[in-house]
Amino acid sequence: MNFKNIFLSFFFVLAVGLALVHAEDAQPRGPKITSKVFFDIEHGDKPLGRVVLGLYGKTVPKTAENFRALATGEKGFGYEGSTFHRVIKDFMIQGGDFTRGDGTGGKSIYGEKFADENFKLRHTRKGLLSMANAGKDTNGSQFFITTVPTPWLDGRHVVFGEVLEGYEIVAQIENVPKGRSDRPVETVKIVKSGELESEDKAGEKGSSHEEL
């Protein structure tokens, strides 16, 4: 191979590499995850494990903060000890009613209910976290996790997070035996919940610079 061919081959490889980098940068990025919370879950007396959820605090800050604070229980009430009271295969699992446990209760950190923040995000895939409601502007504490894409809920329910780890546990819950009103025969309970340190918050602790 002569020098000219080597030279052309080098620039061909370089051009392909740059094109791939550019294509990767051009890929649409998902919503920014600003907080991570966890649920440790039991079915009956059997531990299922931990589900880690990422919250979209840039896109829907009010909704994300409500869920985060209910996960930590820092307001004196929250998700710990509550159940997944409604489970529908090939649709979703629903929880968050920590006052009545049957889908008629719950409350937000802002009062009993708060308004729909926005509908920027859609129910495009499994593992998305969205607010359950009883109609327009009736968000409280109840939520659901999708197990399939649910586009018919777009514009009606606020998507505010996603499952980061432990989706296999969501799938197990989806398949538990159910009785009347899609309620699990054996209780599916959040035995512990809280917040995990996110990369953003860890970085803030190590830096004195203000974010622009």
From Swiss-Prot:
Motif (Prevents secretion from ER): 209-212
Top class in the EC scheme: isomerase
Activity regulation (record text): Inhibited by cyclosporin A (CsA).
Domain named PPIase cyclophilin-type: residues: 38-195
GO terms for biological process, alphabetical: protein folding
Composition-biased stretches (Basic and acidic residues): 192-212
A single GO molecular function term of this UniProt record: peptidyl-prolyl cis-trans isomerase activity
Record region (Disordered): 181-212
Gene3D superfamilies registered for this protein in UniProt: Cyclophilin-like (2.40.100.10)
Catalytic activity from the UniProt record: [protein]-peptidylproline (omega=180) = [protein]-peptidylproline (omega=0)
Keyword Protein biosynthesis: no
Annotated EC: 5.2.1.8
InterPro entries in the record: Cyclophilin-like_dom_sf (IPR029000), Cyclophilin-type_PPIase_CS (IPR020892), Cyclophilin-type_PPIase_dom (IPR002130)
Signal sequence coordinates: 1-23
Glycosylation-annotated residues: 139
Subcellular location: Endoplasmic reticulum lumen
Role summary: PPIases accelerate the folding of proteins. It catalyzes the cis-trans isomerization of proline imidic peptide bonds in oligopeptides.
Similarity comment: family membership: Belongs to the cyclophilin-type PPIase family. PPIase B subfamily.
Protein name: Peptidyl-prolyl cis-trans isomerase B
Gene from which the chain derives: cypB
